[in-house]
């Protein structure tokens, strides 16, 4: 019952919008009638162009929102993978000495890391550059240290790698900075 009422209201509203506005021609000359009709035509043409422009703007906004939603989903997924890549990189730093099995495991871990990095690049994700000067937009200084080898403000050591996805910081790089 409620559905029928809603549908009838929608149809009534549509019919009102489609009903032509009546133009009163009583007592008007032919030239005045033509002028009145031209005014009405111009008014309706303007309404049409405005409605069409609004529709195009809505389409563009919808497409942008759709890509933003997909990008946000990718960011969340990528953020969840960061601890995995961190753990693999810690495992890759293990020194196997002369143990052949450990060397093979390390080689497998390095291959896995490279596959992760290729996948990250494919989806617009990359490591934050940590060579050179400290940049508060992409680096997080967790330590200030004295260093003879580095000038003040230069990155001395990377504690944790940072990542950017599609131009946005996913996780800042945690670094130590020279005094």
UniProtKB/Swiss-Prot annotation:
GO MF annotation list: adenyl-nucleotide exchange factor activity; protein homodimerization activity; protein-folding chaperone binding; unfolded protein binding
Gene Ontology CC entries for this record: cytosol
Pfam family of the protein (one): GrpE
Matching SUPFAM superfamilies: Coiled-coil domain of nucleotide exchange factor GrpE, Head domain of nucleotide exchange factor GrpE
Keyword Acyltransferase recorded: no
InterPro entries attached to this UniProt entry: GrpE, GrpE_coiled_coil, GrpE_head
Annotated GO biological process: protein folding
Keywords: Chaperone, Cytoplasm, Stress response
Compartments (UniProt record): Cytoplasm
Residue span of region Disordered: 1-23
Job description of the protein: Participates actively in the response to hyperosmotic and heat shock by preventing the aggregation of stress-denatured proteins, in association with DnaK and GrpE. It is the nucleotide exchange factor for DnaK and may function as a thermosensor. Unfolded proteins bind initially to DnaJ; upon interaction with the DnaJ-bound protein, DnaK hydrolyzes its bound ATP, resulting in the formation of a stable complex. GrpE releases ADP from DnaK; ATP binding to DnaK triggers the release of the substrate protein, thus completing the reaction cycle.
Annotated NCBIfam families: PRK14140.1 (NF010738), PRK14149.1 (NF010747), PRK14159.1 (NF010756)
PANTHER family, per the entry: GRPE PROTEIN, GRPE PROTEIN HOMOLOG, MITOCHONDRIAL
Family: Belongs to the GrpE family.
Protein name: Protein GrpE
Upper taxonomic lineage: Bacteria, Pseudomonadati, Campylobacterota, Epsilonproteobacteria, Campylobacterales
Annotated gene: grpE
